[in-house]
Amino acid sequence: MNLFTIDTTSREVMYQPDIPAYGHWGLAAVNAAIFALFAFSFFKPKTRRDWRSFGAFSSFLVALFAEMYGFPLTIYLLSGWLESRYPSVNWLSHDSGHLLEMLLGWRGNPHFGPFHIASFVLIGGGFILIARGWDVLYAAQQRHELATAGIYARLRHPQYLGFILVMTGFLVQWPTLLTLAMYPVLVIMYLRLAKEEEREAVHEFGSRYLDYQASVPGFIPWRRR
């Protein structure tokens, strides 16, 4: 891991020699598996809809870590522009994959940059929502009741929001063309899954769910319907 400084006048990044950080497919697989299992331990998918949600999230992780440690497709496709704009950068170093820090002029190790720190907050917050949502949802399912306690008293879909926050965090930390393309598709998918879930809840709980739906926001805590 190397440090760099950025001349804000010339916009060139000065690097120490670095070893190419790609081609590590085993490391990519291990990281994708660790985060997928971490999410699985919190989410615990049971229904077909749960597995669709978890599968989409897992595919995002695979695409992300394949570029982070395997093959830098985004940097390869943008190499002409990147090399002409930042000729002093070793774009095959791991640090260079933190594109937001690189392009916006962060002066220091990108792992301590503002976007990297923000990504940890988003990822951590997302996993907390997924975990807290599961605790309440599982207890309600065991009693065949509507989940309205805990985090569900503030949000109707905390777990879907959690997945979106985790994906947002990874996108901020390590943006790639593939994950940028996948992100809006997956967000729309989660919104549709939430609507599908609500139709089933209305069918099962009737006016109780309609009252809950009218008083508790779906994804944004301070927004009311």
Regions found by a protein language model. Give the residues of each.
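Intracellular coupling helices
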Residues: 145-152
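Histidine-centered phosphotransfer motif of kinases
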Residues: 154-161
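Membrane-anchoring alpha-helices and their flanking helix-loop junctions
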Residues: 1-145, 166-200, 204-207, 211-225
